[in-house]
């Protein structure tokens, strides 16, 4: 379960704060030291670009980190949770440091069978009673493309991570624990918002999830991959940005 592994989130600054407590100045100083180490490593690799722009970017990052600590304190207080796990691996081989992670998430999909899912969730929090878990998936960009989650937490099957994360942790924690999940935008650009505004439970989206995943799985099994480029955006189409074959498709797709 999660509770015995709380030490994974504890570092040289000692115990984590309780849900209603803000982060300490010691925690803030540690975060800044870690950031400075990352800055130095990036500079040593020569990937930081022009000096003036890099200086501005560094200041923006440090400002985001300070705001993150404040936003995190508000989030922990709102949901009554505190961090217990980071980089929650499930269904994957042992990590480089030998950490086994959690078992793969599984779900019986009507008409398809049992599907297994693997991945990594950024963070898992628990409340003090151990009866509520909150899984957070960090996002560093804009929240504009996530607005649809207000009405549909899986966006018509485009965003399936959150229910899968709840499956993975539910299996580890037990059915008596309520497991919720949300995307959290952890920068000024994303305004530190969470989406959906109320973290999602699998029970809320089970029917939609099963239908979407079932359609995807059946299509793969039958070799059906319909072209769906999405809406036209600057420089291409919304569904094609990360496709390896984007340049092979006709421009008037």
Cite the ranges covered by each PLM segment.
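RecB-family 4Fe-4S metal-dependent nuclease core
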Residues: 1-253
